[in-house]
Amino acid sequence: MIKNQEINLDYLSNLSIGILYGGISNEREISLKSGEAIFSALSASGINATLIDHKDAVLWADDQLPLDIIFIALHGPGGEDGTIQDKLDELNIRYTGSRGNSSKLAISKCKSKRLWKQIGVQTADFKILNETDDWATTLEGLGGSVMVKPDSEGSSIGMTQAFNARQLACAYKVAKKYSGTVIAESMLTGSEYTVSILSDETLPSIKIESATKFYDFEAKYFSDNTNYICPSGLSKKREEEIQLLALRAFKSLNCEGWGRVDLMADADGAFNVLEVNTIPGMTKKSLFPKAAKAAGIEFEELVLRILDGVKQ
């Protein structure tokens, strides 16, 4: 259960907040929607906020626009890969969410999964793909069916299922367009879930039911046939299990502030961590606000909680 948090509104109302959104990644349009929603929430709470498209990022380094805290609403490379976090640290500007090193680790599926394998956090078997690989051998080694993913893209961009060598070769080419590193994961066939984390506490899990082959970009942002079940319907024991696993995965990367952990059950029902999102979407369709609402936290309060959690 999420604890009540007393928000220091007097403190926040005296600050100048920059909302960094947009950017140049493949998730730009989603980031624009997230930033606008955050801006509306802060404005409604009387907080002095400025929207800054990352393409115009020179502004927040300019003396003409002094900012106390940056609310990072950038998704994907350029926002979740540690680049902007390192820059803000150089400028000594405080910001929401995880630090640069944690962001770099979380955005890389192969690096984070390698760590989880080492410390016993359950995640699907995987292999980094190369153009010279024997696709049939690779497929056999991962159980005969795989999900191919770009290493550092979010929102399921560039992901493809493969059930034979020809499909695997094609899937590799698709993913390679989005990332220099491509991985193949053993196919997980159980239900998909996500667990949001706010100030080191877990929010109720969400079960995702997609009408498409898998929960892809279209299903996430444009489909009316994707169902989000929250609370997810898990038993109390299973809910505790998935929340503990999500929190362990999050903390193992030294992530902080807020984030979302995506998981999927295997054929035996065991939960497997897919990835950690260090800057979850904050649109009307986004999962983080849905989980917060299930915990009794409305959107405006959620935004204030994230902002108030930035260390003074």
Which residues fall in each region the model found?
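ATP-binding N-terminal substructure of ATP-dependent carboxylate-amine bond-forming enzymes
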Residues: 1-101, 105-111, 130-138, 308-311
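ATP-dependent carboxylate activation and anion-phosphoryl transfer catalytic cores
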Residues: 2-15, 118-120, 235-312
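Active-site nucleotide/adenylate-binding loops and adjacent lid/helix of ATP-dependent enzymes
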Residues: 2-20, 49, 64, 105-185, ...
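A short glycine-rich, hydrophobically flanked beta-strand micro-motif that places a catalytic Asp/Glu
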Residues: 50-55, 182-186, 256-268
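Short, flexible, mixed-charge acidic loops at enzyme active sites
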Residues: 84-89, 214-222, 278
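A glycine- and small-aliphatic-rich helix-loop capping segment at beta-alpha/alpha-beta transitions
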Residues: 86-95, 164-165, 169, 295
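Phosphate-binding site of ATP-dependent enzymes
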Residues: 163-244, 265-272
